Amino acid sequence: MIDKMQAVVYTAPQEMTFINDYHSNQVDRDDDVLLRIQAVGICGSDMHAYHGKDPRRNPGLILGHEFCGEIVDGPDKGKKVTGNPLITCGKCEYCLQGRDNLCSDRDMIGMSRQGAFAQYMTIPKQCLVHTPNTMNSNHIALTEPAATVVHAVNLAIENSFKPISECHTLVIGAGAIGLLTALLLKSYGVKMKVLETNLARHPCVQDHVGVKAVNPLAEAIDENAFDVVIDCVGSEKTNALSISSVKAGGTVVNVGLLSWTSSIDIRKITLQEVKLVGCYTYNMEDFKSALTFIENGSFGDLSWIEEMPLSETDAAFKSLHNGTMASAKVILKPHF
């Protein structure tokens, strides 16, 4: 790791501290590669930490795991990359099945080791994914959340009783994951409804997805109406809404984890043979597919991204916390 650099440290709930001469005491691994971070996104899980609701992310940590960087030295010096932040063992039954997201012996960038809210970061070589040097750095930084979306949509496809293009689909939430989900479904020709309580995000859904977003706090959502429901929020209320709105024989894919516990209508799930499918992150195949989809325009032009300098990280978190940030994704620039 670089001796001194600019970095943002999560120092306490609702407190992100910009440090001009941060010194890392992290012990790097032999196979770690040093990256100069060009762009890094703020994830919903970073917001959970910011709110003090993620016991896995403690004060003193550099958050951030959605990134684009440039290799600093070695034979690939200057090459642009992103990376899978899940550092897995590579030898357990799940890793050998290609389901490395389920590896129980895993570390994670921005959780168990320092993340990308900094000018530099190290990452194991096995996690690197090379990208075209001409590709937009902000778009590359969206690969990680897009990979979660690819995984979620693939699960919906695998568990639906008819082709996804024929499935009337409900997307709950129009944050980054929800918006990207709607955009990918749009590329498949899916007829959908998008729910979002933050009215500031409604114009973005209209402009980029081409559907009018609905505020479920102001408008009732039909019961037993959707073939597929993808919950990108994961609160107790949206969990209940997912089950009530899905058709008999339909599929619910749960992506969001706003609430750590939930009560669901197990009677409906059983009597109407509803498939409830959990979705945790992605595997490396999903990750690489997401990069390809971003590059070929399957997620649209991504012009809705909001860019801010790393020094304004605390302000970015506050605006997301207060609901005043209209954009579904803020990208921080460490070398602004």
Regions found by a protein language model. Name each.
Residues 135-216:
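Mid-domain Rossmann-like dinucleotide-binding core that forms the NAD(H)/NADP(H) cofactor-binding site
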Residues 89-172:
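NAD(P)H dinucleotide-binding glycine-rich loop of Rossmann-like/cofactor-binding domains
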Residues 82, 230, 253:
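N-terminal Rossmann-like NAD(P) cofactor-binding module of classical short-chain dehydrogenase/reductase
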Residues 221-229:
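A short acidic, Gly/Pro-enriched loop at the edge of an enzyme's catalytic core
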